Amino acid sequence: RYTMNKGSAYWLNETRNTDENFDLIELANTQRAITNFVKIQTGKEIPVEFIANNEGDSMTDGKKIAISSLINTHNLDSVIGTALHEAAHCKYTDFFVLKRIANRLLETNLMGGRRWIEMLLNFVEDRRIDNLVYHNAPGYQDYYRAMYDRYFYSTIIDRGLKGKEYREENWDSYAFRIINLFNKNTDLKALACLEEVYNIIDLKTIGRLTSTKHSLDVAIEVYEVLNKYFSMQKREGSKHQEQENRKGAKSNGPSKEEIKKAFAKQEEFLKGNVPKTKVNKKEKQQIEAITKSK
């Protein structure tokens, strides 16, 4: 896990309270630093911007990267990690594949599974591009650890993976456990097909996937395995299997509602919906003026 004495602590000259938010000058300096990191990573001049209240959503579209204005020394490394993750999408993700996914699913008669295939694609593609950055730019690893600690790892998720919840044979259970396959608390016996899914995705050799199309191929393969299993399950029933799934599970795990809330945060990250506090128009203009003056 990530610790606060790494990452930006090497270059940030900061002695203030870790929860005290940055002022406009500090935000401008942070924007400049992240822009440099992104340029080094991608080799491109990709704008890194704060989003004003009247400028719509803050999702990265492959052309620019939006960052939150609510930054302090406590969350700075995770903000940088998120920007680097989005920069990796700009460099490695083929947005044309994402835009034409409906065509691919129509051609293969899989449109009914679009929601789950897109979720699986987001998961596999994130693992693919993060693996590239993690190995090609080891200096950024602490920022990535901070990002994952903020958006993926939590005591609720850790205990939930070992507990009795999300062991029903349905899509929600598989989604929760697939998204957390890289968590050390993963239980591959929690669901009947989870180990097969784990082997198909094969996180240890994720580097074998060299394109977004390859990620989509894996997502479709996983979907087809699970869809076939669920079709068979409707005929045979799942009560006995779910009893087997709960063997060895911890009885003192968190409630389903607690897990659901933490899981929703992970799902939003996968969709690119990372909460980013916006600035007002005047503040944005002031930050831009500070940046241009240096």
Q: Where on the chain are the PLM-derived regions?
A:
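Short, functionally important secondary-structure microenvironments
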Residues: Y2-K294
